């Protein structure tokens, strides 16, 4: 019976991930954006980022149709519309990174006094923290749109801002805070052994702690969505892949700092292009 419960829980977990990705794809289609988060047809147009932003502003004054029907773009500039989008995005991008953590807890079900209720508690606590982060980054997006730093698709209007964001996230990869947070995400078993609590409530408490460290580790990759657009499925896929790799016990420590160098160089290149472009 326990094997059946385990299978149902894992299948449900992966079903939620797949559903979340499908919903993000459906929203992108509904908003009329392509796989890199630009309005359909923008890839064939020339000009710099400022010209592109102006064209998109004209596009977003109308309505765009998709498989799910027509929806005015202005609806995606309010907290009520953006917050659910970010919550779904958190599920699509961050739940896959939790697989090693849930597997570690499963080991304690067989070797210690872990329970399936505790497993669910860990999962819920982890996701609650990311839902809270979704509220924060939704507020940040609204503030950036109000300041005209990004457009209504979450795309940076300034190469300087995009370059600065790359550099800040890249530099964070070398900080002590990143090292501590990544250490917990990279070795969840150590966290469980040092903060062990039994039952659903105990799992929930540990999940909240793990979620907080995970936000501390990965917030920058979420913020990078403001470079190319928060509806960019390409960015979502690449960021998810990197965060999964970064948390793998075998190779996670080897990719953190190289990624920082790449991001810093990308930031310098982006800002430099803003000067000469």
Q: Model features per residue range: what roles?
A:
Residues 1-86, 145, 149-154, 176-197, ...:
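Histidine-/acidic- and/or cysteine-rich, low-complexity loops and terminal segments associated
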Residues 14-20, 257-275:
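Final/C-terminal transmembrane alpha-helix of multipass membrane proteins
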Residues 70-91, 165-169, 198-212:
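Small-residue-enriched transmembrane helix starts and helix-helix packing motifs
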Residues 82-127, 131:
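Juxtamembrane transmembrane-helix termini in multi-pass membrane transport proteins
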Residues 134-141, 213, 266-277:
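Hydrophobic alpha-helical transmembrane segments in multi-pass integral membrane proteins
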Residues 172-180, 202-230:
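Alpha-helical transmembrane segments of helical membrane proteins, especially in multi-pass transport
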